[in-house]
């Protein structure tokens, strides 16, 4: 697109901006090693990182268990503005999309029920509308989104920048976290059951 825009400008035309969405493993967004940082630098020279969306943990279930994110770029527009300041990037935490895993079926869309027990609107449609609204407004909502000025040396994930909304945590959340941690310790062989218990 860089060459195309140079040609357009030489003809007195406006440069063309193209949007590109790409799905990548989280490691590409987290990575700050020399190889990934260099690739990020090259990307940002002529392109703007508009947004990064952290996707559900098992979005490709049952085919793959890789954790992924979606990066949205504007090609042909450097991430640095002409005045040398960095453009802002929207980060969306899109982990809960309203789908559930079902054995032999994969991820299945869920529907809300009305007071009569009839299925109504798709939970996904409600969640999608909220996510699109947050992105379009570049709104910052604790636990859901963040807006930051990042460069090649930074992490490109919402989790690094968003604030947690602790008002929504419950005793069940705490217990579930403790149970998960204990099962991890047992699995790794760090906790043994003895005569008196664990």
Region locations from a protein language model:
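A conserved structural/catalytic subdomain of Rossmann-like adenosyl-cofactor enzymes
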Residues: 1-198
